[in-house]
Regions:
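Short, conserved active-site loop motifs that form the nucleotide-linked donor/cofactor pocket
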Residues: 196
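Sequence-specific dsDNA recognition surfaces
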Residues: 235-237, 382, 409-427
Length: 427
């Protein structure tokens, strides 16, 4: 869940979403902003009085400017409120550390749109776990370069001053919500300071602040860059020089550029960054000038996304990567690497203890070893496009048996239940 399971506002939001579905409301950006603004008004201490706010009868003082930026045209908002007053009768309460504003926004946004932009919102438990691994007393100046509605920044401990918190994103509505979240987290904050620190900018091409001690976040995964964007990035970043540009690789490269010496980078990333060939450029960069302080394997953590993810915490040492002191955690164990290991950009394999590593090294170095490379053929499994049409439970003279991945076990295969006439031109 994006928020904690005991978030009291969840029930309220579920009622709102049910009403929206019942009324078949077209969820435009403006309409979503009205729902978020209504909630924000109540979190600042007002009851469900959104229409009265739009009429100018009530105020939240210096933060009116932040709420107005989210609402936009007041008359259009009033027209919508008058047409659907029940939507604005729900009561929300302020719960520290819960990004209910962000949850309303992401719940209303179209899932297809989020996928196109590579923005899958990070569950709060993942955010808290990432932050728990940081050195809180020495965080210094903190940046989330893809801050969305500000959930990572909300989870920072109270000891981190607003003066040291920065965030940027290309989603204008998300930035307006993040500013409101910062105003709620720091009730005495200056509006100008919030707006200067939380900005709507492209981190890769427009954001020019540097000298950060800590950079945190969940960069976009698989963002669909335009051809124009690719050309700009290719001229600037080594990780964008290949045929396909992976957004999170470029985010890592840029983040390392603007960290202070020995600064910390902590990102939520797909596990593929450690071993897939397409990401070898970023692994080469990491090998040349950083060390891995902590690596946590989380498995599948995002709703509707089958992609194992990791928490990767780096230190920008400016020196070749050292494995000594690296903390490794997965769902079954946690251990520290105490020895220097040979690491190559082709594959970052840190998921073994020192004892296991020594055994494998001994095997490789003491006896003749044969590898699968150059001794095996690799192929993609059959994709028929229509299993009901092409698969059959009956074996014929011309059919072949079909094995699924789950049918292949150690030392045996499961009984064959399906058959296929292999005519690939029909698939």
């Amino acid at each position: 869940s994006y928020v904690s399971q005991n978030c009291k506002n969840l029930t309220v939001l579920q009622k709102l979403l049910s009403e929206i579905t019942w009324e078949q409301i077209l969820l435009t950006s403006d309409v979503i902003s009205y729902f978020v603004a209504d909630c924000a008004l109540q979190l600042f201490g007002q009851k469900p009085l959104f229409f009265q706010y739009l009429q100018g009868k009530i105020s939240i003082g210096k933060y009116d400017i932040l709420l107005d930026a989210l609402i936009g045209d007041r008359q259009r908002a009033m027209d919508f409120c008058q047409k659907y007053p029940a939507f604005f009768a729900h009561e929300y309460i302020w719960e520290p550390g819960e990004d209910i504003l962000g949850l309303i926004y992401l719940s209303c946004k179209n899932m297809g749109s989020r996928k196109a932009h590579g923005s899958y919102y990070t569950p709060t438990k993942v955010v808290k776990k990432l932050i728990s691994h940081l050195d809180i007393e020495h965080m210094g100046k903190v940046l989330d370069p893809c801050c969305g509605t500000g959930n990572f920044l909300l989870q920072l401990p109270e000891s981190v001053d607003l003066a040291d918190i920065y965030g940027t994103d290309t989603d204008a509505v998300s930035i307006r919500i993040a500013r409101l979240n910062m105003a709620l987290k720091y009730p005495d904050a200056d509006v100008e300071e919030i707006c200067e620190h939380i900005t709507e900018k492209n981190f890769l091409t427009e954001y020019d602040r540097t000298g950060f001690d800590t950079i945190i976040g969940n960069p976009p995964w698989g963002y669909a860059f335009s051809n124009e964007d690719k050309a700009v990035l290719k001229a600037r970043y080594a990780t964008a020089s290949g045929r396909n540009t992976e957004s999170y690789d470029v985010f890592i490269e840029r983040a390392l550029e603007i960290l202070v010496p020995d600064g910390t980078l902590a990102f939520v990333l797909p596990e593929a960054v450690l071993n897939v060939k397409a990401h070898m450029r970023i692994r080469t960069i990491l090998l040349q000038g950083s060390s891995v302080k902590s690596l946590t394997f989380l498995g599948d953590m995002f709703d509707g996304v089958q992609c194992p993810c990791i928490l990767l915490q780096l230190v920008a040492t400016g020196k070749p990567l050292s494995t000594v002191g690296m903390r490794i955690e997965d769902r079954t164990r946690t251990f520290i690497i105490a020895m220097e290991r040979t690491v190559v950009p082709e594959n970052f394999s840190f998921r073994m203890t020192d004892e296991e590593y020594r055994v494998l090294e001994k095997i490789k170095n003491s006896i003749p070893v044969c590898y699968l490379a150059d001794h095996a053929d690799f192929a993609l499994g059959i994709v028929t496009g229509n299993n009901k049409k092409f698969l059959s439970a009956e074996k014929t003279e011309h059919s072949e048996m079909v094995l699924k991945g789950t049918d292949i076990c150690k030392y045996h295969i499961n009984p064959v239940k399906q058959y296929l006439r292999f005519e690939p031109e029909q698939f």
